[in-house]
Amino acid sequence: MSTPARRRLMRDFKRMKEDSPPGVSASPLPDNVMIWNAMIIGPADTPYEDGTFRLLLEFDEEYPNKPPHVKFLSEMFHPNVYANGEICLDILQNRWTPTYDVASILTSIQSLFNDPNPASPANVEAATLFQDHKSQYVKRVKETVEKSWEDDMEDMADEDEDEE
């Protein structure tokens, strides 16, 4: 069934395929355009550099008038990410407008890697380390980057087994 939300998501998908912003990728599940898997590559010159962080985006029929539910599936140590992977980002809450699309959502999340907002912490420990003990913060982030690589290797091994 074609609805305004589904048509808009197909346009978002076309844009992601044709002109994906650097360091982000996303696509809907093969059997459900309302649920997307996404990945953000940690930006250069940040502690997250080269990490591969997976996310899940869940849309409902009110999209684009209502933001999707977005959460990290990958482990994330960041001042604005809750332990369950949910993200504290104004455009996913009170500053949402229908002009945002999947690409702009992901680039906004990616920008948090460069510029965390410790004034609005979802993870108090990460915010405190970011503000007061930067070297410890960087060490913890780099541990999650390495974990993201390990998770990717496990996923690739699982895919290889599925193909056999």
Swiss-Prot record:
Its main location: cytoplasm. The active site is at C88. Residues 4-150 form the UBC core domain. It comes from Kluyveromyces lactis (strain ATCC 8585 / CBS 2359 / DSM 70799 / NBRC 1267 / NRRL Y-1140 / WM37) (Yeast). Belongs to the ubiquitin-conjugating enzyme family. One of its GO terms (cellular component) is cytoplasm. The keyword Mitochondrion does not apply. Pathway: Protein modification; protein ubiquitination. InterPro entries: Ub_conjugating_enzyme (IPR050113), UBQ-conjugat_E2_core (IPR000608), UBQ-conjugating_AS (IPR023313), UBQ-conjugating_enzyme/RWD (IPR016135). GO terms for molecular function: ATP binding; ubiquitin conjugating enzyme activity. It comes from the Eukaryota. It catalyses: S-ubiquitinyl-[E1 ubiquitin-activating enzyme]-L-cysteine + [E2 ubiquitin-conjugating enzyme]-L-cysteine = [E1 ubiquitin-activating enzyme]-L-cysteine + S-ubiquitinyl-[E2 ubiquitin-conjugating enzyme]-L-cysteine. This is Ubiquitin-conjugating enzyme E2 2. PANTHER family: UBIQUITIN-CONJUGATING ENZYME E2 (PTHR24067). Pfam families: UQ_con. The keyword Metal-binding does not apply. The gene is UBC2. Catalyzes the covalent attachment of ubiquitin to other proteins. Plays a role in transcription regulation by catalyzing the monoubiquitination of histone H2B to form H2BK123ub1. H2BK123ub1 gives a specific tag for epigenetic transcriptional activation and is also a prerequisite for H3K4me and H3K79me formation. Also involved in postreplication repair of UV-damaged DNA, in N-end rule-dependent protein degradation and in sporulation. Its EC number is 2.3.2.23. One of its GO terms (biological process) is chromatin organization. Disulfide bonds: none annotated. It is found in: Cytoplasm; Nucleus.
